[in-house]
């Protein structure tokens, strides 16, 4: 730009010698405009960098630097946050189209203007005036919220032995936590759909036949028309540490009736800043794993960009001519989770279920004209998707015949799916099946978790694990590598035999989820403790690290613990046709090593604790807005655990002579929930890990709970530190054993049913009281 200005000035000076004096004013005006443009171009494209961390420009990164994260000072973070807030405010008003471009914290370039140069020259992208570009410097933040005390009834399995004669109350204990009000995060549906239609991409065109009246709906000024047909719910989020943002996936459905009868269900991706403000037109610069080359010492990789928000282009089987069957097409129950991939980067994956089909047979006898008739069998199966990887076409979703096969066989004449999507780009996916590619007609409600020890051993996650069913515990182990899912249809998956059984109490073919279904993922407590210990010294305290290390030392060798939230479905239990609430579950695993190698040993699992229904003090919304809470469904569904961190918290303790500051450890868990299948809500739970593990002898002292209060911590006896806690039930599959391992689950469901009954009776009494009050008011008015 400077060279351009200098050359332009020289040109005008030389020309000025040949022109009259009257033209000088015009020349000066032109020069002023050029100078002004140069100032705008060099100042409105803002680059933020930390001058203390300047790295040589290179596109080669070794694995050692991939996990490094360094935040800027709080003052610098606040300053940049103000810029982002102003940027988003301008973008929503007079200056639409402004982008925020975020490079990861571990990006190898940081020197002033290097990000701009890399973006323009290496990535061949264009920057516009007022674009904001920076390398992330934000760290995770806990918001300031009000909390109320809540109690959770938890049932243990009694520590083994014959529990068939023991009453549930003997196995129950109470956990005390603090819970925030629900914070709604639903988007503006009119804006979401308007952007979807205006972008007019291939994915929009593919699904437009399912909602042909969208344009007319958006042209109407009545938002009730939009709200009647479109719903957003089932939100699941993760914190992207390298980018300083929350990434959320949710369902957006279209219906002609209500939220209970969708026609099509799509997945929507959006970003929020660390204060949970939604971000629009944000471009993340992510590693392009599919162009990565690996040598013996290092990996060379390029970067690509993804702009949020947008509808996730997930390949889906659909047929608009089959809508009268009562089923819907598309993505159901999406869950998002971060994994560490083989390149050492954190990468978001999703788990969801979706309708699809497989060829059941080819009928040559009734095909006619020497052609066979292709018959399909319909399934609703579980899939994994890699949000930052892509594939071309739907070759691994549908068993569609190839072109030469179609010449010899007849497809269904009503098959609208013969449209050619073979060149469309989608998110990379893969179906998850039981061993030997076995599948039920309906596969859903799997509860996912990751193995922290596996990551420590290999440096990345090789597998993802699922509780396939809680009753008669069954656990699947599925490979995470996407290598078997080709980008193009240039191979097959004949050697991919699906997931394998990691653990089964009963080695049989009796599959059934029972009343307890999958809800959130399960979080590894061992990793939670390690994450606290790995924090910088400014984020931890000496006594905090000592306490955390002492807990790790007390845990038996080779033990891992997971905590999550399932959901029970109680039908006709006293309120509504179906009631859903969260149920906390605790899963424990012990690795039993062989004489030579623990890796070749056996893994024993145990569902040690299950809670009854948890309402967490959350306001319940009626299924139909103009009717009562016990009509239709009564729904509070846990969707995902957004984050779980251990923080230092200072308490001032008054003594006779002075005030003493005491540093305590307090954990904050963020869970996403859905109410009435129409909301996305955040709820913060404070002190759950404290109650369960960190302070087993103090009965939640950090949660301001009176130690004399009835009910004590289930871990006051340090049950999770018991070496013999996990036993090998899979080797003894008697009826008595089965009753033992399911006893806590049965008790939790029994008390959940009681919760529903009491809830219904309470509402009846309240309704009667309110109706009497209304009648008295009418009498007085008369």
Curated annotation (Swiss-Prot):
Residues 48-782 are extracellular. Its main location: membrane. Residues 1-26 are cytoplasmic. Residues 76-96 have a biased composition (Basic and acidic residues). GO terms for molecular function: mannosyltransferase activity. It is an enzyme of class 2 (transferase). The chain crosses the membrane at residues 27-47. Residues 66-96 are annotated as: Disordered. Glycans are attached at residues 445, 648, 699. Keywords: Cell wall biogenesis/degradation, Glycoprotein, Glycosyltransferase, Membrane, Signal-anchor, Transferase, Transmembrane, Transmembrane helix. It is a single-pass type II membrane protein. Induction: Expression is regulated by SEF1, SFU1, and HAP43. GO terms for biological process: cell wall organization. Its EC number is 2.4.1.-. InterPro entries: BMT1. It is found in: Membrane. One of its GO terms (cellular component) is membrane. Pfam families: BMT. Beta-mannosyltransferase involved in cell wall biosynthesis through beta-1,2-mannosylation of cell wall phosphopeptidomannan. Belongs to the BMT family. This is Beta-mannosyltransferase 9. The lineage of its organism: Eukaryota, Fungi, Dikarya, Ascomycota, Saccharomycotina. The gene is BMT9.
């Amino acid at each position: 730009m400077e060279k351009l200005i200098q050359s332009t000035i020289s040109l005008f000076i030389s020309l000025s010698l040949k022109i009259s004096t009257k033209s000088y004013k015009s020349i000066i005006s032109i020069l002023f405009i050029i100078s002004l443009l140069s100032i705008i171009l060099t100042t409105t494209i803002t680059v933020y960098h930390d001058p203390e961390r300047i790295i040589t420009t290179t596109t080669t990164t070794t694995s050692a630097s991939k996990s490094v994260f360094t935040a800027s000072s709080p003052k610098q973070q606040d300053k940049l946050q103000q810029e982002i807030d102003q940027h988003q405010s301008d973008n929503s008003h007079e200056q639409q189209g402004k982008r925020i471009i975020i490079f990861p914290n571990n990006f190898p370039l940081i020197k002033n203007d290097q990000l701009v140069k890399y973006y323009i020259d290496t990535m061949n992208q264009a920057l516009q005036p007022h674009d904001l570009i920076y390398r992330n410097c934000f760290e995770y933040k806990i918001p300031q919220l009000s909390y109320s005390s809540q109690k959770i009834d938890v049932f243990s399995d009694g520590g083994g032995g014959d529990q068939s004669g023991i009453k549930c109350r003997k196995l129950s204990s109470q956990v005390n936590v603090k819970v925030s009000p629900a914070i709604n995060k639903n988007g503006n549906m009119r804006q979401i759909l308007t952007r979807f239609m205006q972008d007019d991409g291939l994915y929009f065109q593919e699904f437009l036949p399912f909602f042909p009246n969208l344009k007319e709906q958006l042209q109407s000024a009545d938002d009730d028309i939009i709200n009647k047909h479109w719903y957003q719910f089932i939100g699941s989020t993760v914190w992207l540490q390298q980018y300083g943002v929350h990434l959320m996936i949710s369902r957006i459905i279209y219906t002609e009736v209500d939220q209970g009868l969708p026609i099509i269900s799509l997945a929507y991706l959006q970003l929020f800043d660390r204060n949970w403000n939604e971000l629009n037109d944000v471009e993340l610069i992510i590693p392009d794993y599919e162009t990565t080359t690996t040598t013996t010492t290092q990996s060379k990789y390029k970067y690509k960009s993804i702009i949020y928000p947008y509808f996730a282009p997930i390949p889906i089987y659909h047929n608009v001519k089959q809508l009268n069957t009562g089923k819907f097409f598309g993505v159901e129950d999406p869950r998002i989770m971060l994994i560490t991939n083989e390149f050492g980067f954190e990468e978001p994956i999703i788990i969801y279920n979706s309708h699809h089909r497989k060829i059941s047979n080819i009928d040559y006898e009734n095909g006619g004209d020497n052609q066979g008739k292709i018959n399909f069998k319909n399934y609703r199966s579980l899939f994994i998707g890699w949000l930052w990887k892509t594939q071309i076409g739907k070759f691994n979703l549908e068993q569609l015949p190839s072109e030469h096969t179609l010449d010899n066989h007849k497809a269904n004449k009503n098959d609208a799916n013969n449209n050619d999507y073979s060149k469309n780009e989608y998110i990379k996916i893969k179906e998850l099946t039981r061993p030997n590619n076995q599948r039920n007609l309906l596969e859903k409600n799997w509860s996912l978790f990751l193995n922290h020890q596996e990551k420590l051993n290999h440096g990345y996650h090789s597998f993802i694990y699922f509780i396939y069913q809680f009753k008669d515990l069954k656990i699947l182990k599925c490979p995470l590598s996407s290598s078997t899912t080709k980008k193009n249809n240039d191979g097959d998956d004949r050697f991919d035999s699906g997931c394998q059984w990691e653990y089964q109490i009963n080695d049989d073919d009796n599959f059934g989820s029972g009343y307890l279904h999958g809800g959130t993922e399960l979080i590894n407590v061992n990793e939670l403790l390690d994450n606290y210990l790995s924090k910088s010294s400014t984020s931890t305290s000496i006594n905090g690290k000592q306490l955390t290390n002492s807990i790790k030392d007390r845990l038996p060798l080779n033990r891992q613990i997971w905590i999550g939230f399932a959901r029970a479905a109680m039908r006709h239990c006293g309120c509504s046709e179906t009631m859903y609430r969260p149920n906390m579950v605790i899963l424990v695993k012990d690795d039993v090593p062989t004489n030579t190698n623990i890796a070749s040993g056996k893994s024993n699992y145990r569902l040690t604790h299950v809670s009854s229904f948890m309402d967490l003090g959350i306001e319940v919304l009626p299924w139909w807005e103009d009717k009562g809470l016990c009509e239709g469904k009564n729904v509070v569904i846990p969707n995902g655990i957004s984050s779980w961190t251990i923080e230092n918290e200072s308490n001032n303790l008054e003594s006779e002579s002075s005030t003493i500051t005491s540093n305590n450890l307090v954990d904050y868990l963020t869970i996403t929930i859905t109410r009435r299948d129409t909301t996305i809500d955040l709820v913060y739970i404070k002190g759950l890990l404290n109650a369960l593990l960190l302070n087993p002898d103090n009965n939640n002292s950090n949660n301001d709970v009176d130690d004399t209060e009835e009910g004590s911590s289930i871990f006051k006896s340090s049950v999770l530190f018991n070496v013999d806690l996990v036993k090998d039930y899979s080797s003894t599959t008697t009826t008595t054993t089965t009753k033992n391992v399911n006893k806590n689950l049965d008790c939790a469901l029994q008390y959940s049913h009681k919760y529903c009954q009491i809830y219904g009776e309470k509402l009846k009494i309240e309704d009667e009281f309110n109706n009497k009050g209304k009648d008295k008011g009418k009498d007085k008015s008369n």
